[in-house]
């Protein structure tokens, strides 16, 4: 025989259990391995609180189950307010979990009571609630909301987590000191519940609870309460009930009218209390005609008789428990009980609205003192919170029921009397679910409710798409709503103020609601991870949806691109915040069929993989594995898909073009292996001579046709709108491309003469840290992902970036990196503009994604606050050293410690410069007046692609000048061309000096310095006659070394300015008779100071870099390759592949590295220097600063003597000019 103690309210007795009964309880509660002995210790060791056995409904239920129910009965989420006292409940919460022996005794007690009185329905209710309590304990604790464990899918593996906080010291987590730890904890199901669900061990207890509740309802005479026709559920108008609630609050006293219903304030991130005015806004904002649709339903039946207020079934908590049990049977055990579940939650909602109305009537009838008013306000707040919870449960259940109904899993539930078409009915259920979730989130804002609202839209869109909805616009509207809500939810949960906001909300919670809030209302990492996963699936549906209207399709493409931007940015921020999301969404984007979206996703994930912040993250290895698989799959897929299209394209070319390709000497097999390069080269060479040929898909960076249509659409829309004043937008400046860390260890090793580089950055940084002057806009970097021409509806993220404190940049500068072909190196710092708040530091790290350059730069947000502070301190400490040179050294690209060449000292490393912004000039750059009478003795020197060059004498000072006369060839009737503002910004001894410019009779006159030594090409030609071009006088290595040294000095200057020449050749290198070498002709020059690689294919045949031909982003490193071609021209008399056809030369330049035909006739230093310049990989190609330290250039002084000797006693150039005199 076994015995145990039980303490009732009025007596103390020992209940004796039979051996058979005890063994049955052991098996039921899994106590086989526990030794149960007679307890002789004091009674408080068994249970510290009393177990009251009152006769009132709610009090009796709460008395036996006070330590195990979800909600407390006094103001907390408990039974309708008819409880005993707050003190006993508080003591119950502070106590540890009561021993299992007490539950066994209670169950035995209820069994005896039912044997004595089979009609004791209250004992049935208590017994069912006891079993429900034990089910909740197995699921993770008494405060776990079963509906929130539904991850809004049909059937998924239940997350596992050892969640034991409900067993010991759960009250300690109520304090704010432990709150931060609770935020990141995943409140999920325990391992035991996971195992019991898989083995269906919970199926019998769940049915047992539902059976006892059903029997109790029948015994109490309330069976008619369940006769709720389905038409009542569908036609139930929540707006009407909400209006009644608003009217009651309007007519109540001022103290009670200001109910603490939480709402989101648009101007603040904190949680505030709202008045009845907010409830009026809620009822007015919800459009009932949109939510409820017309369906042919039978009239609603007469209402059931009024329930007994003393009946257990007047308690909304009891209906909620019943609904929770049915919800578990529906979702996790796949039983068709959704309709019954909806009925239970619906009944709970009805009772809550009636209680609210009844309390309002009692308040109006009675004269209340201050204590009664506080009690009424407390009860009113409790009802509103409980109403929000039940509405959320009902909305989740209706949404799942809607999909199941459409899937025809629940056809057995329909009766012939109702005669409702499923095709319309499931849409009404969805509308009711949206309405319920919207109202729940309005009266009690919660990110968890917002997440379930997004998944309700998502689920309905998937159902429409799965079962062949005719209206693609409807699917697209639903799925974009879902994606937008996902984005807003995650954006708020990932903000820096989120933890502070949660702490404030926790402090505002009553003591009896804190445990429920911590377990169910905190948007923890588990919710964030699942939100990203569901958002990725929704985004996949959005991208795959095709609209019929052409204008809407254009708008959809822009919106899809912005949605992908938002998703990738949020994904990166989540990983950096420590969340471990699913990779399904990003992998799907990386495999997207649209190339722009695919590149954007691969770039962003590649940047994330290279971030040092996630190396120790658990997702890092999986992310790297997935990216490896994606790259392999994309490569194979692209090869397979492009093979047939390449062959078709080649055969569809015009006959002249096919003949041109055959005459080039390239075989079809070679072309097919590198078809994109071949096609780009063919089009580049023949676009002006062979018309009507197809354009390579990647030749131009944008779809002009779509942009034109979009512009026409915007113009038509703007005709009916009033003109608004233009917004002052911050300058757009994307990334400079390389990610590196600051290294000041080798600053003293750089002896490069770079005094012309602006060195204001460090001073600005120092001033920014000390509250000095505001930095100038020319040195600012403001990052915005979209252009200013975007439509207003797509500017949400740009506005957020400029307004939100989350993205405020550091006042002392942001770190930019250069990962394009831009010279290697180190991190550079710049300062922010006046529009950026200096109160927070959030490091923007901007990179290209991988070593293999892609078409576009990628903007990535990486949190490097600690690194920024450390690097800023290092900079301040080394101001004296860095003030002489603005180049910050770094050996990050030489991690393997292997020198780039044995002829370059190991101390010489790659550098990254900070190119200042070049100011765009206007018409004021032109001098006034006409230039014709200002010059005399005008002689034509030569003709170029865009104009002529003349020699003249300036009358004012009799100095010789060169006049470059260009045809006006600019857009939008503006004479300003890039050559003007680029060349006018240059001031260096190795660059032809710009003097002034004029605008005369439709021509642009550019007055330049005259170089009397001619060009390098002229020096190569021994006789200087056009009729004998092959008679060349090749240069000695020392002469080549001198010319290259002078050119490298000029290239260092251009690189410091961020200028790419793009046409460096022998005819554009001018000489003076004093031995100076100067770079001329900036007609094709551009700037990379905007921080992105250029992609335009231009230049002169035989001097174009491989990355330019491959249509990859390039920068100043392309000029180093052109310098190598110039070396070959001076040494060999011809450029690389000069004896081949133009197409073959371009093709081979892009895919092969050039080799000298006879390298043995040159010194090893010369060959090494040449191959460094001609390296096809721009990342391995040295910078001009590094090349200046090459051993080959040590003989440059002797080369200058050779050059001066060639000019001595030579009047050939002057005679040639006089013979070719051409008057103006």
Curated annotation (Swiss-Prot):
<keyword id="KW-0808">Transferase</keyword>
<dbReference type="GO" id="GO:0035556">
    <property type="term" value="P:intracellular signal transduction"/>
</dbReference>
<keyword id="KW-0418">Kinase</keyword>
<feature type="binding site">
    <location>
        <position position="964"/>
    </location>
    <ligand>
        <name>ATP</name>
    </ligand>
</feature>
<keyword id="KW-0723">Serine/threonine-protein kinase</keyword>
<dbReference type="InterPro" id="IPR000719">
    <property type="entry name" value="Prot_kinase_dom"/>
</dbReference>
<dbReference type="GO" id="GO:0004674">
    <property type="term" value="F:protein serine/threonine kinase activity"/>
</dbReference>
<dbReference type="InterPro" id="IPR008271">
    <property type="entry name" value="Ser/Thr_kinase_AS"/>
</dbReference>
<dbReference type="InterPro" id="IPR011009">
    <property type="entry name" value="Kinase-like_dom_sf"/>
</dbReference>
<comment type="similarity">
    <text>Belongs to the protein kinase superfamily. Ser/Thr protein kinase family.</text>
</comment>
<feature type="coiled-coil region">
    <location>
        <begin position="540"/>
        <end position="569"/>
    </location>
</feature>
<keyword id="KW-0175">Coiled coil</keyword>
<feature type="compositionally biased region" description="Low complexity">
    <location>
        <begin position="58"/>
        <end position="74"/>
    </location>
</feature>
<feature type="compositionally biased region" description="Polar residues">
    <location>
        <begin position="772"/>
        <end position="784"/>
    </location>
</feature>
<dbReference type="InterPro" id="IPR050629">
    <property type="entry name" value="STE20/SPS1-PAK"/>
</dbReference>
<dbReference type="Pfam" id="PF00069">
    <property type="entry name" value="Pkinase"/>
</dbReference>
<feature type="domain" description="Protein kinase">
    <location>
        <begin position="935"/>
        <end position="1193"/>
    </location>
</feature>
<protein>
    <recommendedName>
        <fullName>Probable serine/threonine-protein kinase DDB_G0292350</fullName>
        <ecNumber>2.7.11.1</ecNumber>
    </recommendedName>
</protein>
<dbReference type="GO" id="GO:0005524">
    <property type="term" value="F:ATP binding"/>
</dbReference>
<feature type="region of interest" description="Disordered">
    <location>
        <begin position="693"/>
        <end position="784"/>
    </location>
</feature>
<feature type="compositionally biased region" description="Low complexity">
    <location>
        <begin position="83"/>
        <end position="95"/>
    </location>
</feature>
<feature type="coiled-coil region">
    <location>
        <begin position="352"/>
        <end position="381"/>
    </location>
</feature>
<dbReference type="InterPro" id="IPR017441">
    <property type="entry name" value="Protein_kinase_ATP_BS"/>
</dbReference>
<feature type="region of interest" description="Disordered">
    <location>
        <begin position="815"/>
        <end position="836"/>
    </location>
</feature>
<keyword id="KW-0479">Metal-binding</keyword>
<feature type="region of interest" description="Disordered">
    <location>
        <begin position="252"/>
        <end position="284"/>
    </location>
</feature>
<keyword id="KW-0067">ATP-binding</keyword>
<dbReference type="GO" id="GO:0005737">
    <property type="term" value="C:cytoplasm"/>
</dbReference>
<feature type="compositionally biased region" description="Low complexity">
    <location>
        <begin position="743"/>
        <end position="768"/>
    </location>
</feature>
<dbReference type="GO" id="GO:0106310">
    <property type="term" value="F:protein serine kinase activity"/>
</dbReference>
<keyword id="KW-0547">Nucleotide-binding</keyword>
<dbReference type="GO" id="GO:0046872">
    <property type="term" value="F:metal ion binding"/>
</dbReference>
<feature type="region of interest" description="Disordered">
    <location>
        <begin position="57"/>
        <end position="98"/>
    </location>
</feature>
<feature type="binding site">
    <location>
        <begin position="941"/>
        <end position="949"/>
    </location>
    <ligand>
        <name>ATP</name>
    </ligand>
</feature>
<keyword id="KW-0460">Magnesium</keyword>
<feature type="active site" description="Proton acceptor">
    <location>
        <position position="1063"/>
    </location>
</feature>
């Amino acid at each position: 025989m076994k015995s145990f103690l039980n303490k009732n309210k009025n007596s103390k007795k020992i209940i004796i259990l039979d051996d058979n009964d005890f063994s049955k309880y052991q098996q039921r509660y899994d106590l086989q391995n526990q030794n149960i002995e007679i307890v002789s210790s004091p009674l408080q060791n068994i249970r510290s609180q009393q177990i009251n056995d009152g006769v009132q409904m709610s009090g009796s239920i709460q008395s036996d189950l006070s330590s195990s129910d979800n909600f407390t009965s006094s103001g907390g989420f408990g039974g309708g307010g008819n409880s005993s006292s707050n003190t006993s409940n508080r003591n119950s919460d502070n106590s540890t979990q009561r021993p299992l022996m007490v539950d066994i005794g209670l169950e035995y007690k209820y069994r005896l009571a039912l044997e004595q009185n089979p009609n004791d329905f209250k004992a049935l209710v208590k017994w069912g609630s006891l079993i429900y309590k034990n089910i909740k304990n197995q699921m993770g604790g008494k405060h776990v909301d079963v509906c929130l464990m539904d991850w809004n899918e049909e059937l998924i593996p239940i997350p596992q987590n050892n969640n034991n906080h409900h067993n010991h010291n759960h009250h300690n987590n109520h304090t704010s000191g432990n709150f931060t730890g609770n935020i990141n904890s995943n409140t999920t199901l325990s391992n035991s519940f996971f195992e019991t669900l898989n083995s269906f061990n919970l199926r019998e207890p769940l049915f047992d609870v539902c059976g006892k509740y059903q029997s109790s309802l029948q015994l109490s005479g309330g069976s008619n309460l369940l006769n709720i026709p389905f038409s009542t559920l569908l036609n139930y108008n929540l707006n009407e009930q909400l209006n009644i609630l608003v009217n009651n609050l309007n007519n109540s006293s001022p103290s009670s009218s200001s109910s603490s219903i939480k709402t989101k304030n648009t101007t603040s991130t904190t949680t505030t209390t709202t008045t009845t005015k907010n409830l009026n806004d809620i009822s007015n904002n919800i459009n009932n005609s949109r939510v409820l649709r017309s369906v042919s339903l039978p009239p609603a039946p007469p209402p059931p008789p009024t329930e007994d207020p003393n009946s257990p079934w007047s308690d909304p908590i009891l209906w909620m428990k019943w609904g929770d049990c049915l919800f578990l049977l529906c979702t996790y055990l796949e039983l068709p009980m959704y309709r019954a579940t909806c009925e239970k939650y619906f009944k709970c909602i009805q009772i809550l609205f009636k209680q609210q109305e009844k309390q309002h009537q009692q308040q109006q009838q009675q004269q209340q003192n201050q204590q009664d008013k506080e009690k009424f306000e407390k009860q009113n707040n409790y009802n509103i919170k409980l109403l929000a919870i039940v509405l959320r449960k009902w909305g989740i259940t209706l949404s799942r029921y809607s999909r199941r109904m459409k899937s025809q899993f629940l056809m057995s539930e329909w009766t012939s009397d109702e005669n409702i078409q499923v095709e319309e009915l499931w849409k009404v259920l969805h509308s009711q679910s949206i309405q319920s979730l919207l109202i729940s989130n309005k009266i009690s804002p919660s990110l968890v409710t917002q997440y379930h609202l997004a998944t309700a839209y998502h689920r309905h869109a998937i159902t429409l798409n799965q079962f062949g909805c005719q209206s693609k616009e409807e699917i697209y509207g639903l799925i974009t709503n879902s994606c937008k809500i996902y984005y807003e939810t995650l954006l708020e949960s990932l903000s820096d103020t989120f933890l502070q906001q949660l702490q404030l909300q926790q402090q505002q919670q009553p003591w009896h609601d804190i445990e429920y809030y911590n377990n169910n209302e905190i948007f923890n990492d588990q919710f964030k991870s699942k939100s990203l996963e569901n958002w990725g699936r929704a985004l996949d549906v959005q991208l795959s949806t095709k609209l019929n209207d052409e204008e809407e399709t254009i708008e959809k493409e822009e919106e899809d691109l912005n949605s992908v931007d938002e998703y990738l940015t949020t994904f990166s921020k989540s990983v950096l915040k420590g969340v471990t999301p699913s990779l399904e969404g990003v992998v799907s984007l990386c495999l997207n069929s649209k190339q722009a979206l695919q590149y954007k996703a691969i770039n962003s994930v590649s940047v994330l993989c290279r971030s040092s912040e996630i190396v120790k993250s658990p997702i890092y290895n999986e992310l790297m594995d997935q990216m490896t698989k994606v790259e392999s799959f994309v490569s194979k897929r692209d090869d397979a898909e492009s093979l047939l299209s390449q062959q078709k394209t080649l055969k569809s070319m015009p006959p002249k073009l096919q003949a041109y390709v055959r005459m080039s000497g390239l075989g079809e097999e070679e072309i097919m292996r590198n078809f994109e390069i071949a096609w780009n080269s063919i089009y580049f060479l023949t676009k002006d001579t062979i018309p009507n040929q197809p354009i390579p898909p990647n030749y131009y960076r944008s779809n002009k046709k779509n942009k034109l249509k979009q512009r026409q659409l915007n113009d038509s829309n703007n005709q009916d709108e009033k003109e608004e004043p233009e917004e002052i937008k911050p300058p757009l400046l994307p990334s400079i491309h390389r990610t590196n860390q600051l290294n000041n260890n080798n600053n003293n090793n750089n002896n490069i003469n770079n005094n012309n580089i602006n060195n204001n950055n460090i001073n600005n940084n120092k001033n920014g840290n000390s509250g000095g002057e505001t930095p100038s806009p020319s040195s600012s970097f403001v990052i915005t992902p979209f252009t200013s021409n975007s439509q207003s509806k797509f500017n949400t993220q740009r506005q957020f970036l400029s307004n939100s404190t989350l993205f405020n940049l550091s006042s002392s500068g942001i770190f930019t990196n250069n990962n394009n072909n831009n010279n290697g190196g180190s991190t550079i710092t710049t300062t922010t503009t006046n529009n950026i708040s200096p109160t927070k530091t959030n490091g923007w790290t901007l990179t290209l994604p991988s070593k293999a350059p892609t078409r576009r730069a990628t903007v990535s947000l990486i949190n490097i606050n600690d690194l920024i502070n450390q690097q800023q301190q290092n900079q301040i400490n080394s101001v004296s050293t860095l003030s002489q040179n603005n180049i910050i050294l770094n050996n990050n690209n030489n991690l393997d410690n292997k020198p780039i060449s044995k002829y370059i000292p190991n101390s010489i490393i790659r550098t990254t410069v900070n190119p200042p912004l070049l100011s765009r000039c206007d018409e004021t750059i032109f001098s006034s007046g006409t230039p014709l009478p200002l010059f005399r003795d005008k002689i034509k020197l030569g003709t170029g692609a865009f104009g002529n060059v003349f020699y003249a004498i300036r009358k004012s000072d009799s100095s010789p000048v060169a006049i470059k006369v260009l045809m006006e060839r600019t857009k939008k009737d503006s004479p300003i061309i890039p050559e003007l503002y680029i060349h006018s910004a240059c001031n260096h001894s190795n660059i032809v000096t710009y003097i002034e410019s004029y605008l005369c009779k439709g021509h642009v006159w550019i007055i330049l310095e005259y170089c009397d030594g001619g060009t390098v090409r002229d020096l190569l030609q021994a006789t200087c006659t056009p009729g004998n071009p092959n008679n060349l006088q090749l240069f000695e290595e020392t002469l080549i070394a001198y010319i290259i040294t002078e050119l490298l000095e000029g290239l260092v200057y251009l690189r410091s300015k961020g200028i790419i020449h793009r046409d460096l050749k022998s005819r554009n290198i001018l000489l003076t008779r004093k031995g100076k070498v100067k770079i001329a002709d900036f007609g094709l020059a551009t700037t990379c100071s905007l921080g992105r690689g250029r992609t335009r294919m231009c230049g002169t045949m035989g001097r174009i870099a491989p990355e330019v031909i491959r249509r990859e982003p390039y920068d100043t490193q392309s000029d180093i390759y052109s310098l190598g071609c110039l070396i070959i021209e001076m040494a060999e008399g011809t450029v690389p592949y000069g004896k081949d056809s133009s197409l073959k030369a371009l093709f081979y330049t892009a895919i092969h590295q050039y080799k000298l035909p006879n390298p043995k006739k040159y010194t090893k230093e010369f060959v090494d220097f040449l191959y460094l310049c001609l390296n096809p990989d721009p990342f391995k190609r040295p910078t001009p600063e590094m090349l200046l330290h090459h051993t080959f250039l040590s003989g440059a002084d002797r080369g200058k003597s050779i050059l001066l000797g060639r000019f001595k006693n030579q009047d050939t150039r002057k005679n040639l000019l006089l013979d070719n005199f051409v008057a103006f």
